[in-house]
């Protein structure tokens, strides 16, 4: 199984913890919209004249030295965000606004929840907030990516705002008001790693980010070793709103299946993101497992009793599953996204008897980064 390549930025953060990951192809977009046409800033790893490993930005300038990758951020600091914008932060941010669920979850994982003074709308629909940072539910809302409250955000006078790529214009407007705003775009594993590195550098939490990277890489390596000789069952992953919508090979969810020791039956679909298919196509694929997205609008029972799937191997054998979403959606590029592969590996390979160990790993993650165990839910 190919490993997901850890980006140079995240390697710099985590090298002091002696991380090692095998190279491989990176997943592409994990959302329902195409990936941005403007690429994130690129970095590369090399060595200076003394043999010290360094990370260079796209201009060939030193971004960070590996041995200091988890050292405190020195301010003022100028960073290039995932929209290619240069953002200067004069002093360590004491107050933050996050206009995006994934960046809010990341802030919690980095220990920044008490610095948040405003977050995205519909916080009460995020179980992980109530468990790990219930105070977030009382914070002012700054709206959504479709209806962002620029005036309300500015009124909070935050030291730093973190927004998704869709709100790049809002980030520019905030900058004109003298409020630094970072744009993040964690739509696949590599971009998620870059987003973690970016936010960590901006908020002086690089040591915590290295700890998060360490956990992720250890689980990638563990799954690779465990599943090296395992047969790969064919998996159909059904989308949130429509069973006949599936994740093609260019999506984050496809890499999740691969890491879990499965084969995405739709992996050859690369010219789209959530792709519409027919029942006939599913029957032709005849998957061993059907996996429903964590936020699916339909149930496992709906699929099991669907007459259009009569004769499908997964249905006949009772191998229709739904990705858990009790804490957050593991089939999306959140800080705990690796847990989707951890959980799915046990479901696809019951003969390995790793469910108990997997649950220990899941509990360890949430206890370490969010302050609760998954079994408490």
Residue ranges of predicted features:
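Bacterial Sec-exported substrate-binding components of ABC uptake systems
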Residues: 5-6, 11, 22-105, 207-237, ...
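C-terminal motif of bacterial Sec signal peptides marking the signal peptidase cleavage site
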Residues: 17-21
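Short helix-initiation/N-cap motifs at beta->coil->alpha
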Residues: 82-84, 139-151, 270-279
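Ligand-binding pocket segment of bilobal, Venus flytrap-like solute-binding proteins
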Residues: 256, 274-295
């Amino acid at each position: 199984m190919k490993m997901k390549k850890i980006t140079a930025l995240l390697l710099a953060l985590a090298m002091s913890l002696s991380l090692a990951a095998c190279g491989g192809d990176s997943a592409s977009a994990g959302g329902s919209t195409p990936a941005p046409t403007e690429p994130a800033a690129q970095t590369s790893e090399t060595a200076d004249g003394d043999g010290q490993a360094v990370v260079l930005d796209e201009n060939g300038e030193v971004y960070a030295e590996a041995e200091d990758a988890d050292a405190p951020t020195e301010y003022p600091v100028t960073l290039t965000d995932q929209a290619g914008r240069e953002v200067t932060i004069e002093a360590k941010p004491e107050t933050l606004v996050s206009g995006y669920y994934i960046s809010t979850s990341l802030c919690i994982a980095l220990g920044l929840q008490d610095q948040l003074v405003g977050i995205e709308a519909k916080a009460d629909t995020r179980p992980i907030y109530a468990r790990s940072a219930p105070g977030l539910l009382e914070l002012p809302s700054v709206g959504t990516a479709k209806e962002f409250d620029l005036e309300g955000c500015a009124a909070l006078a935050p030291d730093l705002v973190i927004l998704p790529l869709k709100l790049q214009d809002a980030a520019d407007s905030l900058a004109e008001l003298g409020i630094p705003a970072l744009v993040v775009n964690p739509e696949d594993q590599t971009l998620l790693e870059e987003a973690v590195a970016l936010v960590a550098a901006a908020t002086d939490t690089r040591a915590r980010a290295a700890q998060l990277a360490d956990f992720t890489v250890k689980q990638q390596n563990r799954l690779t070793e465990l599943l090296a000789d395992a047969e790969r069952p064919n998996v159909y992953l059904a989308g949130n709103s429509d069973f006949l919508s599936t994740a093609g090979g260019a999506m984050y969810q496809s890499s999740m299946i691969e890491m879990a020791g499965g084969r995405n039956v739709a992996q050859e679909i690369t010219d789209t993101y959530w792709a519409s298919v027919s029942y006939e196509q599913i029957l032709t694929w005849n998957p061993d497992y059907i996996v429903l997205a964590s936020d699916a609008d339909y149930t496992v029972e709906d699929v099991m009793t669907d007459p259009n799937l009569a004769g499908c191997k997964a249905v006949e054998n009772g191998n229709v599953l739904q990705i858990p979403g009790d804490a957050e959606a593991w089939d999306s590029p959140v800080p705990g996204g690796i847990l989707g592969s951890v959980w799915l590996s046990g479901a696809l390979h019951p003969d390995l008897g790793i469910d108990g160990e997997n649950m220990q790993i899941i509990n360890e993650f949430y206890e370490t980064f969010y302050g609760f165990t998954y079994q408490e839910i």
